[in-house]
Amino acid sequence: MKTLTRKISRTVITLLLVIIAIVLIFRIWVFYTESPWTRDAKFTADVVAIAPDVSGLISEVRVRDNQLVQKDQVLFTIDPPRYQKALDEAQADVAYYQAVMGEKRREAARRNQLGVSAMSREAIEQANNDYQTTEHQLAKAVASRDLAQLDLERTVVKAPSAGWVTNLNVYTGEFITRGSTSVALVKQNSFYVLAYLEETKLEGIRPGYRVEITPLGSNQVLRGSVDSIAAGVTNSSSTVDSKGMATIDSNLEWVRLAQRVPVRIHLDSQPGNQYPSGTTATVVVTGAQDRKDNDMPPLMKLIHRLREFG
């Protein structure tokens, strides 16, 4: 009798364990498939590559690497005395041609007033032509002066927006050329997440759907919403040869790797530079509504945590 009872107990326990295992496997399967998710997501921000519009020696650097700067804050200056001299020269040219043009205008007016009775028509036309030529020369000098003024203003390189200076590689006394990138500015309040989700999961994603973002190595869960889905990605399986013929890569019919599509995610609140642009995160699309952590069983919370690594 005891042997029979023991066998029945073992059988019942085994069945219970099997049922529990089936339930756990089912719950895990549902959890992994009900919500589109990926561990291939990156924090991203708008980055401005700052390059000077003039060439010259760097006179002063007023910021340090990774410093938070405000809009129009001076980053560095480039040889202002040289460009001030160029502006002074251009202003002198303008003054000279203004004086010459005044003289030519009076001469042309005098000859036009005297008329052909006092001098030849050629002399009158020559005076008018000289006046027009000087007028054009003055306009050119004014344009050169305005350009010199603009160059002088551009010797002071300012931040186009608030943000963090990064990869600062300019130093006082260094010669810098026009158009060469000198520093990158990560714009403040421009952070978002780019999640690369498999094409098989796109059916469960719509703009406006709520998203949970877990930075790699962090217990903090950020929230956001789907902003947009990329309209296309590069077809890596097809290229064109030198003769314009299509070249298609060989593929195994029973092995299909899902293409990853970028999905842009808007963050509800900006994290500042706590999670720098380029760092990794796990993203879960929860649907039209946020998922409440208080209603989630402990087991599901554990699975949610393990999903970051698994």
From Swiss-Prot:
Protein name: p-hydroxybenzoic acid efflux pump subunit AaeA
Annotated GO MF terms: transmembrane transporter activity
Cellular component terms (Gene Ontology): plasma membrane
PANTHER family: P-HYDROXYBENZOIC ACID EFFLUX PUMP SUBUNIT AAEA (PTHR30367:SF12), P-HYDROXYBENZOIC ACID EFFLUX PUMP SUBUNIT AAEA-RELATED (PTHR30367)
Metal-binding in keyword set: no
Stated family: Belongs to the membrane fusion protein (MFP) (TC 8.A.1) family.
Keywords: Cell inner membrane, Cell membrane, Membrane, Transmembrane, Transmembrane helix, Transport
Protein task: Forms an efflux pump with AaeB.
Cell compartment(s), UniProt: Cell inner membrane
Superkingdom: Bacteria
Organism: Erwinia tasmaniensis (strain DSM 17950 / CFBP 7177 / CIP 109463 / NCPPB 4357 / Et1/99)
Gene3D superfamilies for the chain: 2.40.30.170, 2.40.50.100, Helix hairpin bin
Topology within the bilayer: Single-pass membrane protein
Pfam families assigned: CusB_dom_1, HlyD_D23
Parts of the chain that traverse the membrane: 12-32
